[in-house]
């Protein structure tokens, strides 16, 4: 008898609970920030590498001015080397989870960044761009850092193109 028992209840709870997206920092004075109207979706084949890294870095750099979403039909635990590499920049990868790509989500996006995903599934009329970047999952620490830095540079350039100011570091 399917649909009953503790496993079915847990599955229903997961299905009814909205997916957690990249957290939006607070607005100051203890108040939550308003949800940004601008959305960028990073669409990947699975969510253990590129798309989650890109969403995390864009959210980190945007400081709540852009909602960065990692979307993938398959969500897996992130590679520990990838999480460690992001932690070196002060980015907590555990704050970013994947959502299933839906037409409604993609319609809300100002831009859909495709990372190893079949573009044929996207339909027409969406602003998209391809980021051809190696998947960092399963690679050594040095390779992961290089990939992370390449994604970070692209994320920063994207924010500049969107007109979102990026704070500079003092030298």
Tell where the protein language model's regions lie, with residue ranges.
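Conserved active-site segments centered on acidic
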Residues: 3, 12-101
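Helix N-terminus capping/helix-initiation residues
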Residues: 100-102, 118, 140
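Short, well-ordered beta-strand core segments
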Residues: 112-113, 128
